[in-house]
Design a protein with these regions (language model features):
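Lectin-like carbohydrate-binding module/patch detector with strong preference for beta-trefoil
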Residues: 1-200, 209-227, 252-269
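Glycine-centered loop/turn motifs
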Residues: 5-7, 243-246
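Surface-exposed, Lys/Arg-rich phosphate-binding patches that contact polyanionic backbones
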Residues: 205
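Extended, charge-biased low-complexity segments
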Residues: 212, 241-244
Length: 269
């Protein structure tokens, strides 16, 4: 567990095929991809102290949702979910040392299975899948290289507004503005419907709603579940074909709360 530091970001690279564990461009998918220079490949470390020990949880730097494993129709699936309960073994992992250098094995607390890269690699898309394995077979498919991601020195620029043809889906956005110390009042949550996926458009609308003169002063943070940690929203919203809920906490630039936010420098060498 010494390679995982609370609040920091990491890449997880499969020893078997060299691909990185990534959050897909949808709401819940997880896969292996070659490109690590993306928020989708960065994972924030959330250490939970539980029963006298430490539990590892990982949430995506893209949309804040947590790496989870759950049982469905007799098999275990890996995906991202909102953290609405603590403690929850669905989201809990333990990093074990492997037989090879500093590589780690990630063992899921609830199933006691290991996170593994599915051995096949799609040569066309240069991607792969992930799943769980019941036992340590000593193969590289279960070994993960933990690469620390340094923080950025400045807030990343939001993507350009999407074209009208890219505006799909609708979100039920619950939003609240935090005070300068990052504290939010539970009674101040408000709701509006947002059409599309553009984070820049969403930022501009929330700045207007909250009376913030410059949209760049409104730092949008997504909260994936009641117990989810705040994740700065720097990518466009996931594709969706249904009405989805989205919790947004707005942090004001220049405040102590803004200074505590950490952005992974995914372009670092």
């Amino acid at each position: 567990m010494e390679q995982f530091h609370d609040g920091h970001h990491v890449w997880l690279r499969s020893r078997a095929n060299g691909l990185y564990l990534c959050a897909d461009d949808d709401r819940s998918g997880v896969s292996l991809q070659q490109d690590r220079a993306s928020a989708h490949a960065a994972w924030a470390v959330h250490i939970l102290h539980f029963n006298g020990g430490d539990v590892l949880m990982l949430h995506s730097a893209a949309n804040g949702r947590y790496l989870a494993a759950y049982r469905a129709e007799g098999s275990w699936n890996v995906e991202r979910r909102d953290l609405n309960r603590l403690p929850s073994l669905t989201f809990s992992w333990y990093a074990l040392g492997s037989r090879y250098g500093d590589d780690v094995l990630l063992r899921h607390f609830k199933s006691m299975f290991f996170l593994r890269a599915l051995f096949r690699r799609d040569r066309i898309s240069n991607s792969g899948g992930v799943g769980l394995c019941a036992m340590d077979r000593g193969t590289t498919t279960m070994q993960w290289v933990v690469e620390a991601i340094p923080p950025r020195e400045s807030v990343p620029t939001l993507p350009d507004p999407l074209s009208p043809s890219s505006l799909s889906g609708v979100y039920r956005v619950w939003y609240v503005r935090a005070n300068p110390d990052g504290i939010i009042c539970p009674n101040n949550w408000r709701l509006f419907l947002f059409y599309g996926r553009s984070v820049r458009n969403l930022s501009a609308l929330l700045a207007i709603e909250l009376g913030i003169r410059r949209p760049s002063d409104a730092i949008l943070c997504v909260r994936a579940g009641f117990f989810g940690r705040l994740t700065p929203l720097v990518t466009n919203l996931p594709h969706n074909n249904m009405l989805l809920n989205l919790d947004i906490v707005v942090i004001t630039a220049g405040t102590s709360a803004a200074d505590r936010l950490r952005y992974p420098n995914v372009d670092a060498a």
